[in-house]
Each structure stands twice: as structure tokens, then as C-alpha cells.
Amino acid sequence: MMMNAFFPAMALMVLVGCSTPSPVQKAQRVKVDPLRSLNMEALCKDQAAKRYNTGEQKIDVTAFEQFQGSYEMRGYTFRKEQFVCSFDADGHFLHLSMR
């Protein structure tokens, strides 16, 4: 009687271990128009200069990251104050976060 329950349980365990792994998902990369990224950088520098009460020439943007529905630019002031500018998928400025 135990054998009748043992074989289906073993067969189920063997079949579960044989399932194929799911394919690796990769993020889509869209090439950003250089003019758009330069405009976003200028807007980010302008907003940071206003927030930190300094000139745009004293603002450095160091990183540009693309996410699924947005963009972020990281930077810092000459006083080493860090910030992040966020943009929507169309490149419109959303907000500036001080770090």
C-alpha cells in the first residue's frame, strides 16, 4: 500500500526538478538623442544653480542614467553638495533632489 503512494510522489519530484529555467529578461536600451541629453543637462544645471544659489559654471553633472520610464542626472556643486535631477520619459524636468 505504501508503494502505491510512493511512486507518484517520486515521479512528481523528478518532474519538478526537470523544468526548464525561464529566459533571462534584459532591459531595453533606447539611444538618447544627443541634443535632448544636452538640453536635459543644461536644465539640470540651471535648476541646481538656482537651488544652491550659485552659477551654472560651478555645477558639474557626472552621471546620466536611463530607467524604464525616466532619466536621472547626478551631479555636485563646487562645495561638493550632491544632487539628482529627474526627468520623465520625454525629457521633461520633474524635480531636483538634494543628497
Swiss-Prot record:
Compartment list: Cell membrane
Record flagged with keyword Cytoplasm: no
Keywords: Cell membrane, Lipoprotein, Membrane, Palmitate, Signal
Membrane-topology annotation of the record: Lipid-anchor
Any Pfam family matching the protein: YsaB
GO CC annotations on file: plasma membrane
Signal peptide: 1-17
N-palmitoyl cysteine lipid attachment residues: C18
Protein name: Uncharacterized lipoprotein YsaB
Organism: Shigella boydii serotype 4 (strain Sb227)
